[in-house]
């Protein structure tokens, strides 16, 4: 039986969604947010939702959304680049993929920050979603 997940994010970390699907996860709902389509995009997320017939919400995810996901049997919420704080609940496990090594790369522009700090390497961090941005257990 496939694990039912919800995915929250933009195109920057679309490969996370691709990997989840390739490994047998069933995406029951997608969430994204408006982007400027200059430096950040959501065209791959929206195209995927349309081609697969998956519901897509382009607004902040709310506690009502989380309750609906739980009712639909969602077993995991995965985030890969999202501008808004996600309400924390114990009803659904939640994980975020952040495009830097935490805690050093905290913030909304981690790759630019790594360059400005002169870091020689960086990476990606998976962590539990907590009340504060980029604060959950790694």
Model segments located where?
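Short, conserved loop/helix-junction motifs that constitute active-site signature segments
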Residues: 22-27, 88-91
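Short, aromatic/basic amphipathic alpha-helical patches
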Residues: 19-22, 41-51
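Residues that mark the start of a beta-strand
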Residues: 2-4, 94
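N-terminal beta1-alpha1 ligand-phosphate binding loop
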Residues: 4-23, 35
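Short acidic-hydrophobic, aromatic-tinged amphipathic segments that line or gate anion-handling sites
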Residues: 55-61
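Short amphipathic alpha-helix with an adjacent loop that forms part of the alpha/beta core around
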Residues: 63-73
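Short internal beta-strands
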Residues: 28-35
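Donor/substrate-binding cores of folate-linked one-carbon enzymes
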Residues: 74-138
């Amino acid at each position: 039986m496939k694990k039912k997940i919800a995915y929250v994010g933009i195109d920057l970390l679309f490969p996370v969604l691709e990997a989840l699907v390739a490994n047998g996860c069933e995406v029951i709902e997608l969430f994204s947010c408006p982007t400027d389509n200059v430096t950040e995009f959501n065209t791959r997320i929206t195209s995927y939702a349309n081609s697969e017939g998956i519901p897509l919400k382009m607004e902040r995810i709310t506690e009502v959304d989380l309750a609906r996901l739980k009712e639909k049997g969602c077993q995991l919420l995965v985030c890969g680049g999202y501008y808004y704080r996600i309400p924390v609940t114990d009803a659904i496990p939640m994980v975020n993929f952040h495009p830097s090594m935490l805690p050093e790369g905290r913030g909304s522009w981690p790759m630019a920050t790594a360059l400005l700090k002169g870091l020689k390497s960086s990476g990606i961090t998976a962590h539990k979603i907590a009340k504060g941005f980029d604060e959950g257990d790694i």
